[in-house]
Amino acid sequence: MDPSKLAKLQAGARIGGKGTPRRKVKKPSKSAMSAADDKKVQGALKKLNMQNLAGIQEVNMFKEDGGVINFRAPTVHSSLPNETTAIYGKAEEKTLSEILPGILNNLGPESLTALRQMAEQLKVSEGEKGADAQADDGEIPDLVEKFDEQD
């Protein structure tokens, strides 16, 4: 065999220094880390004596700024004596307009009125922001002197 080819192969196979091969560190995968987190959550839920609520397909949480936190197929646990509910899973932030068509047929009459009030508040707050931006433009004075020049 050609000595130059042999030297190239040996140089490529050498991992560590001074003749001892070093082992590569195996990093834990993200799924293993999430499994450990799930075990911690399950332990905390057992301490509170929480029961799993099956059959919940979607959870929407409405924020004050008009956004919505949406959970598709979440895991929901609840404990009535402790007055505690735990919702966990993959969350997505959405706007009210994105989520509205899908939830209209699930809402009752009280929820519809509350939703209308939230939509009106959102429109009013957006209108105020636009008015503030226009008012701020009018308050900026014109530059009449050159302050960086010395007389």
Swiss-Prot record:
It is found in: Cytoplasm; Nucleus. Residues 20-29 have a biased composition (Basic residues). Its main location: cytoplasm. Keywords: Cytoplasm, Nucleus. Signal peptide: none annotated. The keyword Cytoplasm applies. Transmembrane segments: none annotated. Residues 35-100 form the NAC-A/B domain. SMART domains: NAC. GO terms for cellular component: cytosol; nascent polypeptide-associated complex; nucleus. One of its GO terms (biological process) is 'de novo' cotranslational protein folding. InterPro entries: BTF3, NAC_A/B_dom_sf, Nas_poly-pep-assoc_cplx_dom. Residues 1-38, 123-151 are annotated as: Disordered. The keyword Chloroplast does not apply. Part of the nascent polypeptide-associated complex (NAC), consisting of ucp15 and btf3. NAC associates with ribosomes via btf3. Component of the nascent polypeptide-associated complex (NAC), a dynamic component of the ribosomal exit tunnel, protecting the emerging polypeptides from interaction with other cytoplasmic proteins to ensure appropriate nascent protein targeting. The NAC complex also promotes mitochondrial protein import by enhancing productive ribosome interactions with the outer mitochondrial membrane and blocks the inappropriate interaction of ribosomes translating non-secretory nascent polypeptides with translocation sites in the membrane of the endoplasmic reticulum. Belongs to the NAC-beta family. This is Nascent polypeptide-associated complex subunit beta. It comes from Schizosaccharomyces pombe (strain 972 / ATCC 24843) (Fission yeast). The lineage of its organism: Eukaryota, Fungi, Dikarya, Ascomycota, Taphrinomycotina. The gene is btf3.
